[in-house]
Amino acid sequence: MTESTDPSSRAGEAGALWGGRFAGGPSPELVALSRSTHFDWQLAPYDIAGSRAHARALAAAGYLSDAERQAMLQALDTLEDRVRSGALVASEADEDVHGALERGLMDIAGPDLGGKLRAGRSRNDQIATLVRMYLRDHAAVIHAMLVQLVDALAAQAEAAGGAIMPGRTHLQHAQPVLLAHHLLAHCWPLVRDLERLADWDARADVSPYGSGALAGSTLGLDASAVARDLGFARSSENSIDGTAARDVVAEFAFVLAQVGIDLSRLSEEIILWNTREFGFVTLSDSFSTGSSIMPQKKNPDIAELARGKSGRLIGNLSGLLATLKGLPLAYNRDLQEDKEPVFDSVQTLEVLLPAFTGMIATLRFDVDRMAELAPQGFSLATDVAEWLVKHRVAFRDAHEITGELVKLAESRGVGLEDLSDDDLRAVSPHLVPEVREVLSIDGSVASRDGVGGTARVRVDEQRAELVRRVAELRARADAAAERRAAASAAASA
């Protein structure tokens, strides 16, 4: 079959935005390889928003009359309605979301008017901008979900009150701590994740629109006006960097991977705590599953999936970094591969976080079991050593004396508190009966009242500070969203 020699026909048939310098159309194999609509179609709302801003910029520069501008904006509104309703979807012939939407616009506005929209912009600056818009919107969604998770953990910490649990290092009994202190220890990494999202947004708040393919545009379009219209604070300082940089995507993928790691660490503990051997927690029926063969099973699937999906998030980051590491400036087609990993990370967390928060909010803690295990494993040994230090024994000697005491108790199969006064004196004359004052988990916890310690008074202060910090971060996020919306509304008015 003879291929058409009309380049506009070839481009239209292929759903591509190029073709004039080619004698023939692309091979079916190349078309299949190049097609990206199966993942970039979700950028369609952002593409249309960008087209509106671009149409206004073209009109301001004199490339569209007032009537053409109005007709173009109406056509874009119709295009958006068709996308939302599903009346317009990407076809097999469409190379990417840009080509599919241009095809849809041509059907609505006609080729004469619709064909004017492409002036002064490239897919290179388009896609760099649209990805930022998508990520910024989803950063706000994930931010709100993380706040809900921190709120759920903080509520559990408040409900725990003075409940004591065994604190561990190396997964071995270490020192008794408040359950609330332990739960709050999982809140602070998530707060830092919230801060990272806010920090990231400050760097993402730059519009590459106007950078063209790499060198900018000769048409005199106001890139700053487009940036404001799309909710950005400013335009890219360098057009090459604007089209080629993907560090903002990689950084976002890192933040999401770090969130995944923080969830995975908590998940590992919940999985352990849910075993018979620990017996610290009971999962809600609504947030656990059973076995297809073992009727007694109640499995911590959400925690296990969170632990598993953290590897997926790390893999997405690693793959993205590997793609970026050897690219010369400016744009390269390799950058098509930036979207699937980060889109997958976004979608993974947006499904995972609500389920994870529900699991946390409905956990029931067996505080009696925790209190029973808290003094085991000679977890009060450090209290004995520090008591000796307070009585003017050098810590090196205190450490040695306490170690001998532990050895004696261990050999008899008893706890430190079960040793007699004679046993204490036999180990060291410094171990007088008054040392028993520290051989209780309540006394141990209460004595650790330095800043950041596990004493109840410090934990209550810590929780109050956490609530304050989260409220501040929530307010900052809300204010940033309002500023973006106001700037966009003002620019498009």
UniProtKB/Swiss-Prot annotation:
According to its UniProt entry, the protein's GO biological process terms are: arginine biosynthetic process via ornithine; L-arginine biosynthetic process
Q: Any idea what this protein is called?
A: Argininosuccinate lyase
Does this entry carry the keyword Lyase?
Answer: yes
PANTHER family named in the record = ARGININOSUCCINATE LYASE (PTHR43814:SF1)
Which HAMAP family does this UniProt record tie to the protein? Arg_succ_lyase (MF_00006)
Predominantly, its location class is: cytoplasm
**Which EC number(s) are documented for this chain?**
4.3.2.1
Please report which protein family the annotation says this sequence is part of: Belongs to the lyase 1 family. Argininosuccinate lyase subfamily.
Q: Which Pfam families match?
A: ASL_C2, Lyase_1
Q: Which InterPro entries match?
A: Arg_succ_lyase_C, Argininosuccinate_lyase, Fumarase/histidase_N, Fumarate_lyase_CS, Fumarate_lyase_fam, Fumarate_lyase_N, L-Aspartase-like
List localization entries: Cytoplasm
| Catalysis: reaction(s) | 2-(N(omega)-L-arginino)succinate = fumarate + L-arginine
Going by the UniProt record, its keywords in alphabetical order are: Amino-acid biosynthesis, Arginine biosynthesis, Cytoplasm, Lyase
Q: Name one GO cellular component term.
A: cytosol
* Lineage, top ranks: Bacteria, Bacillati, Actinomycetota, Actinomycetes, Micrococcales
Question: Is this entry keyworded Plastid?
Answer: no
Q: Which organism is it from?
A: Clavibacter sepedonicus (Clavibacter michiganensis subsp. sepedonicus)
Q: Look at the named UniProt entry and state the broad enzyme category this protein falls under.
A: lyase
User: In which pathway does this enzyme or protein participate?
Assistant: Amino-acid biosynthesis; L-arginine biosynthesis; L-arginine from L-ornithine and carbamoyl phosphate: step 3/3
> What's a single GO MF annotation on this record?
argininosuccinate lyase activity
